[in-house]
Amino acid sequence: MHLKPYGANVLLTGSSGSGKSTIATAILERLDEQQYQFCIIDPEGDYESFEGALVLGDPSRSPSVDAVMDLLEKPDQNAIVNLLGVGMADRPAFFEGLLPRLQELRARSGRPHWIVIDEAHHLLPTSWRPSSTTLPQELSGLMLITVHPDHVAPAVLSLIDTIVTVGEAPEQAIEAFSAALERSRDAGEPLEARPLASAPTRLENGEALIWSRSSGESPFRLRLAPPRGERGDPGRLDRVDPDLVWPGHIRVPDGGIGLGGGHASTARLKFRDGILAVLVAQ
């Protein structure tokens, strides 16, 4: 799987216990290996054991925005912002104060390359009305993780390029995403594009259903490589369906972040112009 370090916004969604954190961890490991910087907003302490970043905050101590920014000034440091010490009602305000600072750092340095927001429906609820300075329309390198995509602020959902769903009834999560955007649209605006109708999808362990909003294609299933701690080999990304290779893409370009192994039949993904493309290495 290849993630372009700029220009993509991803929604990772699924029911509780479906493997969202596992997939996010696998992606973050590859980002760390390729020296792309990230900042994880971690409301529940789910990433405390992640080895590629420094944790700021704990259940008895809230993190400091200044401390987060001081850490991210160092290009080789990733940050996990643990919000267990911040009251539930105060977390959206904390994040609203942190995001502009992250954007200022990006404007100066281009970093962090990715901002990962777990439990996004709590930090960015539907009632959130950000200003243009808090949430600029050109914001990219954003990964939202949530059980309830329809409970996330529409202004944030509108930035999403690609949806990755796991767990039971994954197509329902995509439907909830599209419905949330439709409810928020102004009169006269065109309807949000929806995925082509397909039969209900049953995913096996390790699989995800992926949909690109702008592709005009139906969602497709893909088996994802697990994190290092859950595999006995370097890992690979296996194609689920041999027909899921998009025309016009036959080689994986240099660069990007590989989430598959080097096996000859390995299928790979790459974000390109907001599209998650399936590529097969030859």
Where in the sequence are the language-model features?
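Short, glycine-/Ser/Thr-/acidic-enriched flexible segments
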Residues: A8, G17, P149, P170, ...
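Intrinsic-disorder-associated interaction segments
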Residues: R61, P170, E189, A264, ...
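Conserved phosphate-binding elements of NTP-dependent enzyme cores
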Residues: E119-H121
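Conserved ATP-driven motor cores of ASCE-family P-loop NTPases powering translocation/secretion/packaging/pilus
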Residues: G141, H148-S214
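Exposed alpha-helical structural elements
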Residues: S64-A67, T134, Q172, A176, ...
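Short intrinsically disordered coil segments
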Residues: G19, A180, L224-R228
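Conserved P-loop NTPase motor module
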Residues: L11-T13, T201-A281
